[in-house]
Amino acid sequence: CITEEKKKLITFKWIISVGLFVQPCDIDNILEIANANKLWVLDDAAQSFGSSYKNKISGNLCDISATSFFPAKPLGCYGDGGAFFTNNENYYKIAYSAHLHGMGSNKYEYDRIGMNGRIDTIQAAILIEKLKIFKSELIKRSELAEYYKRQFLDLGTNIKLPKVISGATS
């Protein structure tokens, strides 16, 4: 439990929006809150990859987005991995450096703490092939979701089913 005194000491810098079930967040409302409070937004598109919001593809809804290639995600490979998306050159340079152990502009100088963030070649090969069928997989998922929705509705139960938010595709 955070006391009122401790709340006054907390400084927020980020909002992390998380899309779920191949559905993006209502990013307009999130960006409005972020802009009003001078906060950055990181869109976690790991579960929403392949969806769209107001004709913008998930992974491209704000300045910084990320996705995961974990097998259970919409665009999964057979191991771990992920991707970072940005149109901001400064964010790109920081992320690029961080994924190469923090390497700076000189090969043997390190500007920050980093890690090895490169995906291995086997996972990359799997993703290249999966990208070729990704759209058809999304269509099949939507068809199956609609089928299950009809089946649950036909049961006449009080089960609450997920709805796609206004302006979004799933």
Model regions and ranges:
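Hydrophobic/aromatic residue at the end of a short beta strand that borders the catalytic acidic motif
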Residues: 22-25, 41, 77
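Active-site PLP attachment segment
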Residues: 60-99, 103, 121-124
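PLP-dependent aminotransferase class I/II
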Residues: 1-10, 14-18, 23-32, 36, ...
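Conserved active-site segment immediately N-terminal to the catalytic lysine
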Residues: 16, 43-76, 106-111
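Hydrophobic residues in well-ordered beta-strands that form the structural core
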Residues: 41-43, 86
